[in-house]
Structures are given as C-alpha cells and as structure tokens.
C-alpha cells in the first residue's frame, strides 16, 4: 500500500525502535493503551501482547485489511475509524499512550493529550519538535509547547530515530519522547487563562513581556488600551521588562495569576 503524504504517513518498520518505545512505556496486563495511527500494525501487535486492551485511532480506511487481521488475532484490540482530533478521548478510559504520531498533527494532538488524564505517554515526533518539548528558558527551543508540557508532566528524551527506521523514509530525523503526568509544579488560578497567556506571549517570544502582552491582548479577551492601564497599575508586581524566552515556567505561572486576578476577577 502506498502511504499518504497528505496524512503524513511514515510507518515505523524497525522493530528495535518498536521494542524501545514499548519498554519505555512499561506496559503491563493491567494497562489500557491508546495508539494513534495504525500503520501496518507493527506497534499495535506488540502492545496487544502485553496490555489489557488497546484502542487504535486511525483515519485511513485503506488500512482496514491490517486492522481486520490484527483484530482477528487479538481480541483486546479495537480500531476507531476517525480523526484523532475529533474523538472524545475521555470516553476511552486509557491510562497509557504509545504512538508513532502523524507529524502534521503533532502539536494539536499533544495539547489534546495533555487535557486528558493518563499516566505515561511514549510518543514519536519529528526531532526538532521533540527538542521544543524539552526546551529550557533562554534557549532557541523554549516555546509555548515547552511550558505547557512541563507544567504538569516530566519529559524524557528517549532516543533519536533515523529516517531509515520508517517506510517511506521521512526527510527528517525523529525522536521518541516519554511524558509522565504528575501534579503541577506551581499553582495556577485558572488553567484556561494560563493557556491564553501562553498563546499571547509566545507569539512574540523575543519581545519584552509587556510588549508581547499588549500586542496579543486579544488572546486574553481584553482591549489593548484597558490592558495598558492594568499593566501600569501592577508594574511593581512583576518584571514586565524581561524577555519572554527568558521566563521560567513558574514565572509565567506567576504572571498568569497576577493578570487573572487583575483582569478576569475584577470584571
């Protein structure tokens, strides 16, 4: 079967990396696992041998022969034919995620995962995307993604994966990353507002916090001039002259809380 470029299909063929991903997830007979992207089922079969149940979300119906073969062999596998971004993941009740993700949905599907409860996720990404996930302040890789993930997950870079591990060979290197959910490192007054602040400031990561906030005031649903007034009133509460890319995640949390208490709660 010819893989779809539109769907970003690169099937993982190298069994060494399949085994490495599964070992990193520490799958047991009590685990309910979510996989996004069936491929030809190399990963699915290995998961099914170990897990209590495996849900696979796949959009490409051309892969149905592979799905039927796997489900006839393993009764603990269910394939959901849908767009993973449209599926209500909360209904599935999984506790682990193991997937070779379609790279064009890496960002939205990762943010969707983070909105759900899980213990561990072992995921394949483009190498450059993976570096952003583990990005630290004052580095080129530090981003909204870095802060969003590190807020309530430990991130571990497992290994780099060469193009030769896939069919067809992608043009870039890939990487396996492990996310372990945990309690947040710092208190957030309102998580939706926190995400809005992240969206606002990282649109202008090289600017000062003040300039970034003003230029993206719409992300926080506040008029630009009103925000200027508020920032003037709270200028002693935070160093708004700092550059966005230098702010540690906990400082961004502090910024979010100050803004929330002075914007939303006083409306």
UniProtKB/Swiss-Prot annotation:
Binding, S-adenosyl-L-methionine: 12, 37, 58, 83, 100
Compartments, as annotated in UniProt: Cytoplasm
Entry GO MF terms: RNA binding; rRNA (adenine-N6,N6-)-dimethyltransferase activity
Keywords: Cytoplasm, Methyltransferase, RNA-binding, rRNA processing, S-adenosyl-L-methionine, Transferase
UniProt xrefs under NCBIfam families: ksgA
Stored Pfam families: RrnaAD
Coiled-coil annotated residue ranges, if any: none
Protein's organism: Methanococcus vannielii (strain ATCC 35089 / DSM 1224 / JCM 13029 / OCM 148 / SB)
Gene3D superfamilies the UniProt entry points to: Ribosomal RNA adenine dimethylase-like, domain 2 (1.10.8.100), Vaccinia Virus protein VP39 (3.40.50.150)
EC number: 2.1.1.-
SMART domains given in the database record: rADc
Cellular component terms (Gene Ontology): cytoplasm
Summary of the function given for this chain in its UniProt record: Specifically dimethylates two adjacent adenosines in the loop of a conserved hairpin near the 3'-end of 16S rRNA in the 30S particle. May play a critical role in biogenesis of 30S subunits.
Broad enzyme group: transferase
UniProt entry tagged with the keyword Ribonucleoprotein: no
Family, as annotated: Belongs to the class I-like SAM-binding methyltransferase superfamily. rRNA adenine N(6)-methyltransferase family. RsmA subfamily.
Protein name stated in the entry: Probable ribosomal RNA small subunit methyltransferase A
